[in-house]
Amino acid sequence: MDQRTIGFIGSGRVTAFMIEGLFRAHTNLAITVMDANPAVSENLAQRITSVTNAGTNSKNVGKADFLFIALPPPNVQAGCESIAPFVGQHTIVVSLAPKASISALSNWLGTDKIARYIPNAATSIGEGYNPVAWGSSISESDRKLVRELLSVLGDMPEVDETNLETYAVLSAMGPTYLWPLLDEMITSGVRYGLTPDESARLVSRMAVASANMIEAPGKDYATRMDMIPSKPMADIEQDLRGLFRAKLDAIHAKLSN
């Protein structure tokens, strides 16, 4: 891939793991970041020394080959309107934010070359599950450029825009549902006598293999559970499911309205 310029408006956690993943796979990127709080973008540029900090200067960020909107939903409109005068005619905009539709982004930015992309943290190691939805006016050649840049970050299913908030709840936020449980298992392993490395390896391998079984032929939930004779959590499973379901429903409703 020829050298590409990339701008990020917003320099928080998502920007950081996106850049980490991009630099793992691409060596010819010129990345500039900006943030309404210049201390945030400066901190990121100090941690990732290949990144240029534009502070609050929108001009260079807006004219990049790829402009990533990496802002929390309440800040997206203001951020887009602030950078709109500087967006280049060639610039492809990729929004990482839930809630803000392609139609709204187009109105705020004054461009139709827009895609929405929902990354998750595994993007940082090239194993993300990151759906993309295309604006109706983005050309196939521009879509190819986006795929070329982002496919190295993990799976990139092309989905209907109306489903992106569901992906945000289940994929982007999904690790935060699992990691506390897995971390508690690792801690328990150490408490029972394993070394931290032994316990982490055990739990990691167990979790990966268990996840792989979800898509294995003939291994639906009931079949998988029936394979294990001892089920220590059976007496609280329905309570846990109820709490979990209520939380997921609340998050999804918040993002979808």
Report the location of each language-model feature:
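A structural micro-motif
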Residues: R4, L29, V51, T91, ...
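Internal alpha-helical scaffold of NAD(P)-dependent oxidoreductase catalytic cores
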Residues: F86, A104-K113, Y129-Y167, Y177-E215
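NAD(P)+-binding Rossmann beta1-loop-alpha1 motif at the extreme N-terminus of oxidoreductases
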Residues: M1-V61, G128, S188-Y192, I251-N257
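Small-residue helix-packing motif on alpha-helices
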Residues: S41, N60-V61, V76, T195-V203, ...
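NAD(P)-dependent Rossmann-like dehydrogenase/reductase catalytic/cofactor-binding core
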Residues: D2, A200-N257
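Rossmann-like NAD(P)(H) cofactor-binding subdomain of soluble oxidoreductases
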Residues: M18-I19, M34, P38-A39, I48, ...
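Conserved phosphate/anionic-ligand binding catalytic regions in large, soluble enzymes, centered on
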Residues: L170
